[in-house]
Amino acid sequence: MNVLMAVILLLASPAAFCAEQSPVKLAKPTPEQAAWQDMELTMFIHFAPSTWQDTQHDNLSTPLSSINPEKLDTEQWVDVAVAMGAKQIVFVAKHVGGFCWWQTETTDYGVKNTPWRGGKGDVMKDLAESCHKRGMKLGVYLSPADGKLGIGVGGRAKTPEAQENYNRVHRQQLTELLSLYGTMDEVWFDGSNIVPVGDILAKYAPKAMIFQGPQATITWIGNEDGVARYPTWNAMSSEKARSGVSTGHDGDPDGDVWMPSECDARIRADWFWSTKNLPTLKSVDQLMGMYYRSVGHGAVLLLNQTPDTTGRIPEEDAKRAAEFGSEIQRRFGNSIAETMGKGNAVEFDPGKPVKIDHVITQENILEGERVREYVIEGLVGGEWKQLCEGTAIGHKKIDQFAPVEVAKLRLRITRSVAEPQIRRFAAYSVWGDNPPKAETPEIAAVTRTLWHWSSENVPLEMTTTNLDLTAFCKDAGVYVLEFIRTAGKDLDVQSVDLISQGHKLDKFVVRRMVRGTPQYHIKISEEGTAHQLQLSVKLPEATSRGQATIHRMIK
C-alpha cells in the first residue's frame, strides 16, 4: 500500500452538505460481528451421501458400506481455503438427509457405520485440527431437518411426542459439535430452527455468529447466487431479526439490531459434487462479478467447495479457487493512495496526477452505519468531476468507473445521520489501459403465472386453495407473489401460508405494500424441497378475475 500525501479535508458547512440528526439510536455491531465482517471471504464445504448419488438431496439410497472417501485430506481443504484468501471454513457436518460426519451415538446414519478408517474416522475432528493448526477459523452447519428421522424444515416433527424425541437428538448433536472440537466461530441452522438451543449456544459458543433461528446474529442475503442487493443495510428491526428467517431484503438503516448479511454461493452449479456438474465450474470473471456484488456491497461471501467421492476437492476446483484469490489480490492488494477521516468530506492528494478506475470506501461500523448518500469526485483539468455516487457504504463499498486521471480525489457525504466516520477511502488502478468491454451481466428475474382465479374456481365466501410451488420455486431465495386483477374488483386475500411436508412454516411469508399494491414475500430456504401455498381467499364480486404471478427477487 502506497499512501501518498494523504490530506483529510473536513468540510463542516451545513450549506454545502446535509448532516441529519438521527431520529433513532443507531444499531452497532458487537466486536465479534465486526470481526466477522472483516473476514469478507469464507469457504463452505458440502459433503454428504448426495455426493455418491449424483443428487443434491440425500435420497437415503446409498449403502453406508459404499461411503469410503479413502483420500480425504482436511489439510488439502485448508490449503484451498488459504489459496482463495478465505479466513474461515464452514463445514456441513450434517445436511438435511441426516448423515453425520462425526462420531455420535445419536443416530446410526453416520460415519461410524462406514468402512472409512474402520468406522473410527471423524471428519469434524480432522478438520478442526487442520484449521486450528493453520489459524483458520471454523464454523459448523448442523441441519435442523433430518430426512433419515423424518424431520422437516427447521426441525419440525410430525407429532408432539416425535418433536420431544427429536429435540433431545438435535440438542445432543449440537452440544457434541460445539464442545468437542474447539472454538466454533459460526453455527449454521439452514431453514431456521424451532428446537430450543439458546442455552447450548450461550454455554458453548457465546461469541459465534449464528445463521438463522431466533438467536441469529447474521442474516441470509436471500439467494444462493452470491449477490447482495444494493443497498443492503446492516441494521434491521428486532422483530425481523428474531424471526429466525430474516434476509438482506429486511435491512433497514434505522433498525435497532445489527444483522450483517452473508452471501452463500456455489463455485459450480450445485452444492454437492456430481458428474452432472463437471462443465459448470465458474470462471474467474464470474467469481469476481460475484465478489463485487457481495463483498463490494458490504456482505460476507461464503463460497462453496465440493469434495468428490475420494474426499478431495477436485484439482480443477482447487486451481480455480487459487486463481480467484490471486485475482482479488491483483486488483485490490495495493492501493494507489488512501486515507481516512471524519465529517462530510474526505479528500486526498496523491502528489501527482494518477489514473484510477476503482475506489473502495469503508465506514467505521463500530460507530454504526451513518452514511445515507455519497458522491465520489475527481479533480480533472482543474475542476471536480463526479465519478460515481451511491447510498450505503457500511463495511465496504467497491465502486468502479471508466479509467480517469485525477489530481485529487474526494468523497462527499451528501446525506448522513450523525457525523460520518470513514475508516478507509482508497483508490485503485485495476484495468490500466485495458478496461473490460462489458460488466458481468446481472441475473434477470423471470415472472411466471402461478394461478388464475375467477367465479369458476373461487366462491363469494372465504375458501381455502392450495397451490403447488415445487415447479416454480426450485432455487432457494425470496419469491414475490402478486395477485393481478384483470376484471372486476381485487381478490379478497385473507391469508397466505407456506406449507412444507405438512407443516405450516411460520414467518416464512411476509405481506408488504409496494407502491400501494400488496405483495407476499415468500422465503424458500432449501432448494429442491416441495412447498405448497395455502390461500384463504374469496371473490368480492362475481365478475372478479385475474392471475397470481410469482418471481424470485433479485434486487
Task: Annotate each PLM feature.
Residues 19-403, 412-444:
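Mature catalytic domains of secreted/periplasmic carbohydrate-active enzymes
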Residues 351-358, 406-407, 473-480, 528-534:
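Extended extracellular/luminal ectodomain segments enriched in beta-structured repeat modules
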Residues 13-14:
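N-terminal signal peptide c-region/cleavage motif recognized by signal peptidases
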